């Protein structure tokens, strides 16, 4: 039994055609905060992550945008060639744009970090069957087999932190210390949210 296809998957063929023919796409789009806007995009490639399709491209202001299909209310293919600039062509390939990334977010201010984690039995079997990231390498195993340690070269984006949290108490960050402290702070905020029922995600005043 397969999972249900991602929402608005019917746009995929038209978007791939626009990429191939270097056409632009016109979207009516809703942001995560409920703001609706019209966007003109020159698409470069698409990416599937956690049952959501995304189109990555350049808007009219030469800004890179990453738009999930499921927030598109209306889409039109503008059948007129509008090639990407040479600079954007070099940047906007999956390998170069997502170098060192996990998931869909590419934060300009997040540098690739050498991260060391510890995974406890039996969770380490899972992340060896389905690695967290292509750079994942096993570097240590305890004598009693209770844990294994791994290194990863990855940007610590929100997507990556959420993946670590998904594994719960079965994975802990060892290095760098800054990321370890960040994870501890997130867990403390989560605990306070559960205890008080109040928002602790940094967006309380929105």
Predicted stretch roles:
Residues 1-30:
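Bulky hydrophobic/aromatic content
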Residues 32-34:
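Short acidic/polar, Gly/Pro-enriched loop/turn segments located at secondary-structure boundaries
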Residues 38-40, 66-69, 116, 149-151:
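Well-ordered beta-strand positions in beta-sheet-rich domains
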Residues 51, 70, 144-146:
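Beta-strand-connecting loop/turn residues
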Residues 52-56:
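Short aromatic-glycine-enriched beta-strand elements
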Residues 96-206:
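Polybasic (Lys/Arg-rich)
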């Amino acid at each position: 039994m397969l999972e249900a296809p991602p929402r608005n998957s019917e746009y995929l063929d038209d978007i791939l055609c626009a990429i191939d023919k270097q056409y632009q796409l016109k979207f009516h789009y809703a942001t995560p905060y409920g703001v609706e806007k019209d966007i003109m995009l020159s698409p470069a490639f698409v990416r599937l992550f956690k049952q959501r399709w995304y189109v990555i491209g350049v808007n009219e202001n030469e800004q890179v945008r990453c738009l999930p299909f499921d927030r598109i209310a209306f889409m039109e293919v503008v059948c007129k060639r509008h090639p990407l600039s040479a600079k954007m062509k070099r940047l906007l390939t999956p390998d170069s744009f997502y170098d060192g990334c996990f998931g869909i977010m590419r934060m300009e201010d997040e540098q690739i970090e050498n991260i060391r984690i510890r995974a406890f039995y039996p969770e380490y079997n899972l992340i060896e069957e389905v690695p967290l990231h292509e750079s994942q390498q096993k570097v240590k195993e305890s004598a009693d087999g209770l844990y294994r340690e791994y290194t990863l070269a990855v940007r610590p984006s929100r997507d990556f932190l959420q993946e670590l949290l998904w594994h719960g108490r079965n994975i802990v960050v060892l290095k760098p210390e800054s990321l370890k402290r960040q994870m501890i702070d997130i867990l403390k905020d989560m605990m306070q949210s559960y205890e008080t029922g109040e928002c602790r995600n940094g967006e309380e005043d929105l």
